[in-house]
């Protein structure tokens, strides 16, 4: 047992001795290259969270997911299709903001015309600009109150910190999404009520009304060109 432990310790020492040393050379004006790489990898790992927090993805995926429930087909389209459609629509909606970040922040940073700090400030400015445009005023004021930030101390909306803007934006997106879903539910609910009334008047109580109303709801949605109407309405709600 002691021999095995000794061999294990010596092997570990040999392995660690083979690891090349990491040199950190501090440059002038910018962060160390190694620190930059660490920051890049950290941001890359946070992409799913960033996608949800800073973009229109939340509203899109909630509306499209609950639309399936309204039609009566909770498994169709499948989640993969809903998420894929939401992603492409998100990139479509966010393109003006992405173009601004690319031209005003990323390209100057690549050309080494601005510092790391200025780069992050510009990215924050354009991301915050998008979120503030689609955040309800009352929701923003509520989160300012929770954060104990007096409204009088905020002269411009862009002075509000991200820790306030992000949750206010997400709550506003959820509220808007549920308002849209409520309006989408109404025509399908009417179809369910009409079918249920007809079945009861005919004395047919053993067959679930949803089973009969489902083909009519699908036909109504297709004839009204529902997918195009819903998608275009979602996109235009950000313009």
Curated annotation (Swiss-Prot):
Record keywords: Bacterial flagellum, Bacterial flagellum biogenesis, Bacterial flagellum protein export, Cell membrane, Membrane, Protein transport, Transmembrane, Transmembrane helix, Transport
Designated name of the protein: Flagellar biosynthetic protein FliP
Function: Plays a role in the flagellum-specific transport system.
InterPro entries: FliP, T3SS_IM_P
GO biological process terms held by the UniProt record: bacterial-type flagellum assembly; bacterial-type flagellum-dependent swarming motility; protein secretion
Cellular compartments annotated: Cell membrane; Bacterial flagellum basal body
NCBIfam families (UniProt xref): fliP, PRK12797.1
Biological source species: Aquifex aeolicus (strain VF5)
Membrane-spanning intervals of the chain: 4-24, 37-57, 81-101, 180-200, 204-224
Main location: membrane
Family, similarity comment: Belongs to the FliP/MopC/SpaP family.
Gene Ontology CC annotation, any one: plasma membrane
Membrane topology note: Multi-pass membrane protein
The keyword Repeat is annotated on this UniProt entry: no
